[in-house]
């Protein structure tokens, strides 16, 4: 699909007209694990579905287009995407990253550092990242916004500085999606997502994606993914394509809802701080009395107390015991992820119901 089209058009028409044999408008679901060769020495382009599958290939085509990238690979989960991205870097690489990041990423970073595979340096602010880039760095890895403190970073500035030092730049774009941010355009070498979240958008798909503009990186990534086999299944590829079609509409609605909810939270006597970037559906906030958090979570009727984010349903998460439980308390507290923080993923419900639910739980 042409990247010259506007992103809303690319999304709405994701995967259409891909079946030349029948003219089917919707991308077919190809379950076959193997493909017949027309003749000896000939291939249709598909041989074994771990290597390449028609449905997955169509999903990857759309994912590359919306991220302004030339290449995309769909993986079996967001963590599989992170592991795949790091598979192209030599053992012993020095990685500079942010302290505030997804707990699963921290858990894996911590494990591979113990094994001696990579060495990590953590920074709390953009200024600290810039200062650390004066040192020997092989990889700059950032989330922006970060999870869950919602810190934003200037990708273009950091990429320019990193590249001047010969470092590669990897960006996790899960929170914003390509609707609000396309890091490839700002100089990132690799961009990844937990496609489970906003891209698929319905809490029924486990998926990841890695995109790049570099043929050299793509060939390494493709080889490693084919070898390890953590590919996205045909069915999940089909579901992902379907979810992508409404991405821009969902992001627009969740952002509109989030802005109204932020306005409410900022006036609530039960809330002492709200963390929101002004766009997207992710909000974090700190309560006045953290002892009331169990009551708040148990009192909600419209919000679901659950991990994950980016679906059409609104969720509330307590990072201390859920997404960031593997990060030691003293580490979390040192950079501001304290036990009084709750995270919201705002869905597409009527915002009046969402605000009413929060009000009765926070102030009741």
Please describe what each predicted stretch is.
Residues 1-53, 61-62:
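N-terminal "arm"/small-domain region of PLP-dependent enzymes with the aminotransferase-like
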Residues 2, 11-13, 72-270, 275:
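Conserved PLP-enzyme active-site core in the AAT-like
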Residues 2-8, 230, 263, 310-311, ...:
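Positively charged, small/polar-rich N-terminal and surface patches that mediate targeting and assembly
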Residues 34-83, 87-88, 104-111:
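Conserved N-terminal alpha-helix of the aminotransferase class I/II PLP-enzyme fold
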Residues 119-121, 250, 318-364:
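PLP-dependent enzyme catalytic core of the Aspartate aminotransferase-like
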Residues 242-249, 281-288, 343-347:
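Short, well-ordered beta-strand elements within core beta-sheets of diverse protein domains
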Residues 259-313, 327-329, 333, 359:
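Conserved small-domain helix->loop->beta segment predominantly found in fold-type I
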